[in-house]
């Protein structure tokens, strides 16, 4: 069972529950050698740091003394780990040696027998440089083994959860096919396999595309494991692309070669030995100088270096979790991807997939938008803004520029005559910013440095296309000046309540429909904050319809506002339909759980304001969705939406 608690980009801070044990994602699974004598880092430390580990059932199976202990006492006792134990099936050995001495069903039976929490099918790992024919042949065999493994578990009544590995080599259409076929089987976790050769060769562009083409076709309610990814420099990008789990033997393997992991690369202990201190404050680096550690006996040096590597690995995971909660994961990704040019290739290629990524990215975040480089132009926040500009119902448009020194929000620093013209400001980052919505996230909640000329030109084509599409509504400067002078001389501006007009446009941008018709425009009023002087509420006959949330200026409906949205928005827009059995709980304002969702607006994005209705489209409650439209239909565990209020019968 998997539940999302917080999110940013496609990263998910969630909880996986397996056999009553909980794993917080994203997380790393340290690789544990099934032979305790060969384990580099003590299991006491592993037990303190990890919720889940991964070990090798094939080595256990083929080593008589290990097999005997595992079969009599269980895998947890063998490796001395109390929480979730995942096992590989021998697929790695198959990829290295070309053959293994165990059958696909035999290894499933063994993993169940030794009490594994999550087992893995014996899939066929297919490296990136094989022919397409070979990749297709291997994939068909993996499908057969997967189907047989699922059938075996069901027929035998096995309790273990199963990994269904996605294969397909470098062929993206085969990755899609693999995800489609495997995704229809009842697997619990979906590892993306055979990417280690790509990572070893710094082919991060291909890694990113393999992840995305797999994610696009996998069920959203299952965790995704990036098999073999153990270097912390890759975690942020991989999490942003939707990976929940990683496994690492790197902490030990690198230590044996004297390599010192950091969050943005790898150093060599020998090259560091003349430094006064380590660039790290973990327990190992605090107790030893580089020279002291370098001069230790080899076995002890390896153990301590492995401990540092493990510390820095978990530290990066914790940093990513915090970035998800704070809403600045993209900034961390952009920072990490500048640690190596090939990693930057991985970041740049994802712009091709922004239509998919945007569907999973929250509409609002705790942190503002920080522009850290040219790649920021392709962030989902900007992509979404450009799309949602088309939601606004324009009558007359005037496009202009402002001085680079003009502070945001623009409308507070410009002498703008109130009228019914939509004034759009050319913006180097966001393309076009309508003055009437310029306080909404992320248009005012951003920090951008001085830009190079080529960056300033990035949106020229977008602006030209917008103006061409709306050419009949565009006013040139002479027409615009005449128009506003006409309003000024005839005092027509008295007929326009600029605050109400503004809120009407904000509602169009947020909800995609004209919520305030002409009749309502004359009846509603706004109320400004006494402290900030900014619009705070929209009221109808002294009753609050909407409140403008201070941090992002989104319009949050009160009960009457929810009723107005329900009236103005056609079904199923901004709706979540719930089962009749939980109507009373929704009316009482209690959270909506995923398993009770029957239908929804498929275009919903995470953290949008939603209407909770029954199958007859009767309004029951209103609140905020945690999941997007696809997830709402696929998740069957955890909270789907938190409610602000319910409507009593």
Curated annotation (Swiss-Prot):
Annotated EC: 2.4.2.48
Residue stretches spanning the membrane: none
Comment on bound cofactor: Binds 1 zinc ion per subunit.
Annotated ranges, domain PUA: 573-648
Known catalytic reactions: guanosine(15) in tRNA + 7-cyano-7-deazaguanine = 7-cyano-7-carbaguanosine(15) in tRNA + guanine
InterPro entries on file: ArchSynthase1/Queuine_TRR, ArcTGT_C1_sf, PUA, PUA-like_sf, PUA_sf, TGT-like_sf, TGT_C2, TGT_C2_sf
NADP recorded as keyword: no
Protein's pathway: tRNA modification; archaeosine-tRNA biosynthesis
Alphabetized SUPFAM superfamilies for the sequence: Pre-PUA domain, PUA domain-like, tRNA-guanine transglycosylase
One Pfam family of this chain: PUA
Database matches in Gene3D superfamilies: ArcTGT, C1 domain (3.90.1020.10), ArcTGT, C2 domain (3.10.450.90), PUA domain (2.30.130.10), Queuine tRNA-ribosyltransferase-like (3.20.20.105)
Catalytic residues identified in the record: 88
Binding site for Zn(2+): 280, 282, 285
Sites where the protein binds substrate: 123, 194
Enzyme class, broadest EC rank: transferase
Cellular component terms (Gene Ontology): cytoplasm
A GO BP entry: tRNA wobble guanine modification
Gene Ontology MF term list: pentosyltransferase activity; RNA binding; zinc ion binding
Protein keywords: Glycosyltransferase, Metal-binding, Transferase, tRNA processing, Zinc
PANTHER family: QUEUINE TRNA-RIBOSYLTRANSFERASE (PTHR46499:SF1)
Role description: Exchanges the guanine residue with 7-cyano-7-deazaguanine (preQ0) at position 15 in the dihydrouridine loop (D-loop) of archaeal tRNAs.
Sequence similarity: Belongs to the archaeosine tRNA-ribosyltransferase family.
Name by which UniProt lists this protein: tRNA-guanine(15) transglycosylase
Organism: Methanococcus maripaludis (strain C6 / ATCC BAA-1332)
